[in-house]
Amino acid sequence: MNLQNYEYKTEPYQHQTDTLELSLDSPLFALFLEMGLGKSKILLDNAALLFEHQKISGLLIVSPKGNLPNWDVHEINKHLPDRIQRNVLVWQPNHTQRWTTAYKKMVEEDSTGVLNIFLVNVEAFATVKACKFVEEFLVTHDAMMVVDESTTIKNPKAKRTKHLIKLAPLADYRRILTGFPVTKAPLDLYSQCYFLSPNLLGFSSFFAFRARYAITQSRTMGRLSFQQITGFQRLEELQESLKDFSIRKTKTECLDLPAKVYIKRYVELSDEQKTAYGTM
């Protein structure tokens, strides 16, 4: 599978083509790209290619609740080629008859030739209810599962993290998308990479991972003793271990990006807003 005959809906920048070529048919991959570098476009082109080569029939996108409308209304319509027929369904905790009918169509009916796209907010994975519906979707599809803004699953103790990690093996392809640098919060990587595969970083537990890369000091507070993280170590080793399944790009590396455009927008303030503004 290659990009030679693939027809984009929106023309990619060079860094997007490079990233797509690198991640194209990989079962698991991490896109560590700064905000503004078009992670969603890369992901949707990747899904389109896999669908056209009959590798997937479903796409599950997990995203913060505030981002779901952007995926639903903007990103999918903008970047997914029009030639690809799709059904898009956004998770609703309170199911209407219309929603239930649309969901059943996805998981029960023959949808050959149609890419089923299920958008679920990451917060919903704290509930068993959402997990059951997602599990059914994954079981009934050859699926790509994506966690957008994957730092939302950085806490290994959180219910959402545990549930997503448990569901992950049901997906044929897995992706995480985030823009944070390793040096800023290296311990946050553990759960995100564990979602992709438990074996990626070579540690059987978060505590073993922390012992390797965190510098700690024993502290006491009353009768309570604990290990306080005071710094980090071996970060070059950690970055090296990520190279086989990820790509890291910053805006300064992407020379073909257009220049920033600043637009002035003037708004009329209400009397209440003018009063508040005057007190600043």
Segments predicted by a language model, with ranges:
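Conserved helicase motor
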Residues: G66, L89-T100, V122-T127, K154-K157
